[in-house]
Amino acid sequence: MNNENSVIEQQVAFVKSLIAENPGAVIAVATYTAEEFAELRKGENYTLFKQQERKFAEALCRAGVPAERVVFVEIVSVGYYRFIAERKMELGEASRSAYAAWLNNNR
């Protein structure tokens, strides 16, 4: 659990830095990879992943990250995202770059 909290803290710090570097951008974050999503499609571990997503969202909230600056995404296939926000948003160029950076730093 301690290691899990450390990872979440690192992810929160990274999202906060992206927000600071990209004023006005909406940052897209995912709590699992495309490979993990393939497992979800088989019906495995869905509850576990949703719990991880909730923990991350709660950590972002505690860290003072504005909800309107972050949208959670599930990777469905290359180039297509199913948004898990209350409203759907189109990602601007800065957010696409931030999302790519987040994925690269969390493989």
Over which residues does each language-model region extend?
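Extended, charge-biased low-complexity segments
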Residues: 2-46
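Amphipathic protein-protein interaction modules
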Residues: 47-104
